[in-house]
Amino acid sequence: MKIFNIQRFSVYDGPGIRTAVFSAGCNLRCGWCHNPESVSGAQQLKFNADQCILCGRCFDLCEKKAHGLCGGLHTINRNVCEVCLNCTKECYAEALVPVCREVNAAELEKSIITDEEYFKHSGGGVTFTGGEPMLQICDLEEILKICKNRGIHTAVDTAGAVDFGSFEKIIPYCDLFLYDIKTFDGALHKKLTGQSNELILENLKKLSEISKTGGNFKLWVRIPVVGGANADIGEMTKIAGFLSGLNIDKCEFMAYHKLGEGKYKSLGLTAADSFKTPPPEFIEDIKNIFGRENIKI
């Protein structure tokens, strides 16, 4: 599986204390994404400028002369950089690092079981997130089976924009689906993410039906609330109306934040400035809307 991070002691990706495995690659293009390194799935060069000690090793090493000094600061010409990663091998300060790495199921298992005791005492487990982990369905199925056989609680965080056959492969090994819904309006969804939400909504309905008729998993819906995108009472009311007819165990609202801006800079990208954090009172308003539809928050 191609991943870009393993985060321990997470308390935001399902119940209890969890280990979150972040897969690389996503088939949506949400402009507010706080994990830009997860999107392309291709290898990238990350530059942590605050860790650079200006030793100059990368200046001498780079055949394309992508590294240089400007005003006493280390700069990277991304237009000529070929992401060969030779510079990362000589950067002992770890200012230059590759984004992705390939890990097999055995390596993932070894990393995950390190925190098994925390899982047992907190009701936690492992969450596969991203990116979109279901784009690597064969690898995901393999590691889910391993975790399930060890009695580790398993969760998959997905945007749902995949063929339902992928869900069918992992349903027997998944205890919880964290299912992202951005909008109900199809045209708005395509504008914000680059894709229609028709498949996403249809897959959620299918998961709901399986859950209701004996599926041995929980279904949580997570809604990013983004000012300048979907933070609209009318849109949230439509989502609530849609979810009210489904077998949803819980709904969570994730207010947009700007903590990912530094990641964009480290990749040589510019974060969009059109998105805003919604005020707390707006979150309370939509909680009331969902509450009136008897959706558990």
List the model feature ranges, each with a label.
Residues 2-4, 70, 157-161:
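Short gly/ser/thr-rich secondary-structure transition/capping motifs
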Residues 14-15, 22, 40, 44-45, ...:
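N-terminal-biased segments
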Residues 94, 149-150, 293:
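Conserved dinucleotide-binding and phosphotransfer motif residues
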